[in-house]
Each structure stands twice: as C-alpha cells, then as structure tokens.
Amino acid sequence: FNNAYLASENDMLKEALDFSVQTGFIQDFSIVAKVILDQKSPFLKSLLINKGTKNDIEKGMTVFSKDYLVGTVIETNYLTSRVLLLTDLNSKLPIVIEGTDVNAILEGTGNKLNLKLSYLPENYKIEANKIIFTSGKDGFLTPGIAVAKSYLNDKQKIFIKLLSDPDQALIVNVTNGQINK
C-alpha cells in the first residue's frame, strides 16, 4: 500500500517538474510545492503549500495545478504560503474570451462549477464552448493562459467552469506568471 502511494506521488512530482517545459514557463521561476492544507469553506477557498520565503515564494506569484492556473499567492511565511484559489469570492481575474476582443473579470463564487463574468459589454452574450484566457491587464500574468470554459447546461443556460479542479490539487507549481515566448 505504501509503495503504491509513493509511486503515485513520484509520478505527480515528475509531471510537475515537466510543467515548465510543457507550458513555456521559465524554469528559474517555477517552484514545485505540495499542498499541506485545503481550507474548506462554502465561499472562502484557499490552499496552504509547503514552500515559503525560504524558497523565494513571493506574494502575487501564480499557482498552477497540472497545466492550469488555480490561484495566486496571497500570504507568505518562512516555510509556507497561502494560495487564494480562483473559486474564492475575493478572486478577480482580468480575462479575454476566445475569438473575441471582449474583456471582462472572472470572479470566484465559491463554486468551481459556475464562476461569474463581470463587466461584460452591454448586450454581449457569451456562447458555449468558448475558452477564457488571462488578458494580462492585471500587470502580473502573461496574456493567453487558458483558465476556464463556457458550457451550456441542461436548462440551456451558459455557465463558466474552470479548466482545473482546485479541490484535486496535491502538487502545484508556483511561478512569477511570465511565459518564455
């Protein structure tokens, strides 16, 4: 049993180390960390990771699980850091919608299956199956990082769902948000 767990964790770590190569992130600014506490609350969503200022983690750095953005470092200590997830009510991310020049803000709702788009142009209706990317207008993240997708539910209503599942994050990559193009 213990060997199977270690083998599984080893595979996750290898995948995390390949992250910078797969996504184009600069290796010097990609730090692998383990999630040590998942703050469960209906609306407040955060993770505690096992890397801090000792490992050059800084407030404002971006956090990825697998290949997808899950949040931002909001607090650092010597050995740990707190990550605000995109699903948190306090999370607001400037985005652009695939195939358009429409900018908006992706807001957390506490529900990973239905985030909110704010500040859309008047009378704009988002279509289903559109990828939502970072716009870069926050000055931290490079534009073009895929974050979420629009879906049509059973009631023919559009909802926004993250491409990642922050609740499943065990190993994460912490970066400065810049892509090596």
Task: Give names to the regions the model predicted.
Residues 4-5, 12, 16-181:
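A secondary-structure micro-motif
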